[in-house]
Amino acid sequence: MARVTVEDCIDKVENRFELVLLASHRARLISQGSSITIDRDNDKNPVVALREIADETLSPDDLKEDLIHSLQKHVEIDEPEPDPASLLAAGGNASASGDEEEDAPEAVTFDQMSEEELLAGIEGLVPPEKSDDY
């Protein structure tokens, strides 16, 4: 049964190594209690996962994204970029205020932090959780 299922899955996921990763991830999800989308027919979890991929009840792209998300330790949060129209409006007001500022080179300034503020920030940090990776 599994051989026929794998041959059906190669049409959906061309790389057989990626197919193994996706099917094993899905089989682990099933063993953790995730609901299955097809009839089990007394098959084991890896065979059920392969049949789900072959029957296209699950998208391989969705499985791939879920696998990547499960392996990530640090998730980056995309912060919204400032609106270009508001930047132009703010820049236009500054240049209209005086012509002398336009000729002078623009000075780059950074936020200044005192040593006490830095130490208070460091003391407020929470140590990372211990993991078995080390």
Curated annotation (Swiss-Prot):
Secretion signal span: none
One of the record's GO cellular component terms: DNA-directed RNA polymerase complex
MF terms (GO), sorted A to Z: DNA binding; DNA-directed RNA polymerase activity
Origin superkingdom: Bacteria
Catalytic reaction list: RNA(n) + a ribonucleoside 5'-triphosphate = RNA(n+1) + diphosphate
EC number: 2.7.7.6
A single BP term in Gene Ontology: DNA-templated transcription
InterPro entries recorded: DNA-dir_RNA_pol_omega, Pol_omega/Rpo6/RPB6, RPB6/omega-like_sf
Top class in the EC scheme: transferase
Span list, region Disordered: 77-108
SMART domains xref list: RNA_pol_Rpb6
Biased composition (Low complexity): 85-97
Keyword vocabulary terms for this entry: DNA-directed RNA polymerase, Nucleotidyltransferase, Transcription, Transferase
Alphabetical list of PANTHER family matching this protein: DNA-DIRECTED RNA POLYMERASE SUBUNIT OMEGA
Similarity comment text for this entry: Belongs to the RNA polymerase subunit omega family.
Matches recorded under HAMAP family: RNApol_bact_RpoZ
Subunit structure: The RNAP catalytic core consists of 2 alpha, 1 beta, 1 beta' and 1 omega subunit. When a sigma factor is associated with the core the holoenzyme is formed, which can initiate transcription.
Function noted in UniProt: Promotes RNA polymerase assembly. Latches the N- and C-terminal regions of the beta' subunit thereby facilitating its interaction with the beta and alpha subunits.
Protein name (Swiss-Prot/TrEMBL): DNA-directed RNA polymerase subunit omega
Organism per entry: Rhizobium rhizogenes (strain K84 / ATCC BAA-868)
